[in-house]
């Protein structure tokens, strides 16, 4: 894995991430005009970065945030649809793969249910090869219907890719799920705003380290009249070190080459920091020295995860016992979310 050149090789996947300025749009026509702008950017980037195999745009980059619910429902897209047709044509022309945001994608029961927050991975032939729906929307603000699974797709030069979105990335479980399914590159598209800049930079680096995987983050920049977005799109190596990171500038681009062979060699041969292997071979040195086998312990020692899988309702009740029972809070109501008349007070 390396940074600083504009090339790539048979062993390296050239990945670019974009600090796309958050648009403020209201109509389908405006959305399609913006999609064409993104398509033109892709074709220009390929001229400057001839090794680019994959380009990643942030969450909300195509449609912006529709703060008006009627506009959100009216502009909700189908997949495939007009927006993806524009992106597919650009990927074919530029001979590159791309990750694009659709906020939102129409629910199967549209317009009776809220849309999904969706990413698509499109290959260099213009085919949609992965569609991921955000599993953990940013409540209480985001009103998206949650998705229910992650995916892994063989990407350019055989690199295995998973997609996650923004607030998903605050939960270590989703990173681990992608990595344990075989993901070598986890792409996190986000429309993250201040104040949580340092936390998000730290989270991406920590999850690359913890999951022995590459991470590509594309984040929005600018101000949309409601939120200010901090950019810092970045590409991170599987050892948790940043290869390249934008600042807060609008339309900043970072680029790095991610080696396919290096990550596979590390996962096969690293020992003390091979977190994926060691999690399912716990204590193998001591177990071997004790004459109890050569594989360590595979059983899950974490009661929370066992409860969640076997009895999700019980797990929910357990977390409510230490937090609260309603989704809203009386001291800072948001929208029409329900809340009790009084929350726990400090020390209660």
Swiss-Prot record:
Broad EC category: hydrolase
Domain CN hydrolase: from-to ranges: 13-260
GO MF term set: amidase activity
Keywords: Hydrolase
EC number(s) from the headed UniProt entry: 3.5.1.4
Reaction equations catalysed: a monocarboxylic acid amide + H2O = a monocarboxylate + NH4(+)
InterPro entries in alphabetical order: Aliph_Amidase/BUP, Aliphatic_amidase, C-N_Hydrolase, C-N_Hydrolase_sf
Signal peptide segment: none
Active site (catalytic residues): 59 (proton acceptor), 134 (proton donor), 166 (nucleophile)
Organism superkingdom: Bacteria
Family, per entry: Belongs to the carbon-nitrogen hydrolase superfamily. Aliphatic amidase family.
Protein purpose: Catalyzes the hydrolysis of short-chain aliphatic amides to their corresponding organic acids with release of ammonia. Also exhibits in vitro acyl transferase activity, transferring the acyl moiety of short-chain amides to hydroxylamine to form hydroxamates.
Protein known as: Aliphatic amidase
């Amino acid at each position: 894995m390396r940074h600083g050149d504009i090339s790539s090789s048979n062993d390296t996947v050239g990945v670019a991430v974009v600090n796309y300025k958050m648009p403020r749009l209201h109509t389908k026509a405006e959305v399609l005009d913006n999609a064409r702008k993104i398509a033109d950017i892709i074709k220009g980037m390929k001229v400057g970065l001839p090794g680019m195999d994959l380009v990643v745009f942030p969450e909300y980059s195509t449609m912006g945030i529709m703060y008006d619910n009627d506009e959100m429902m009216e502009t909700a897209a189908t997949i495939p649809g007009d927006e993806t047709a524009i992106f597919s044509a650009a990927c074919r022309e530029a001979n590159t793969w791309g990750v694009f945001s659709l906020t939102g994608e129409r629910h199967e029961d549209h317009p009776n249910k809220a849309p999904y927050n969706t990413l698509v991975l499109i290959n260099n032939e213009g085919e949609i090869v992965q569609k991921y729906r955000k599993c953990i929307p940013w409540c209480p603000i985001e009103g998206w219907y949650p998705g229910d699974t992650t995916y892994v797709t063989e990407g350019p030069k055989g690199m295995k890719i998973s997609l996650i979105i923004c607030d998903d990335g605050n939960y270590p479980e989703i990173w681990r799920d992608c990595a344990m399914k075989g993901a070598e590159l986890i792409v996190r598209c986000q429309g993250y705003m201040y104040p949580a800049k340092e936390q998000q930079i730290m989270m991406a680096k920590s999850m690359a380290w913890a999951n022995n995987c590459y991470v590509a983050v594309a984040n929005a920049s600018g101000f949309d009249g409601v939120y200010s977005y901090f950019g810092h799109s970045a590409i991170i190596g599987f050892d948790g070190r940043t290869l390249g990171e934008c600042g807060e500038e609008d339309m900043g681009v970072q680029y790095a080459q991610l080696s396919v062979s290096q990550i596979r060699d590390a996962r096969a041969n690293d020992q003390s920091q091979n977190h994926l292997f060691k999690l399912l071979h716990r204590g193998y040195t001591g177990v071997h020295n004790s004459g109890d086998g050569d594989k360590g312990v595979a059983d899950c020692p974490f009661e929370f995860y066992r409860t969640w899988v076997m009895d999700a309702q019980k797990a929910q009740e357990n977390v409510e016992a230490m937090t609260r029972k309603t989704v809203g809070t009386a001291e800072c109501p948001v929208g029409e979310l329900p809340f009790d008349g009084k929350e726990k007070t400090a020390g209660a």
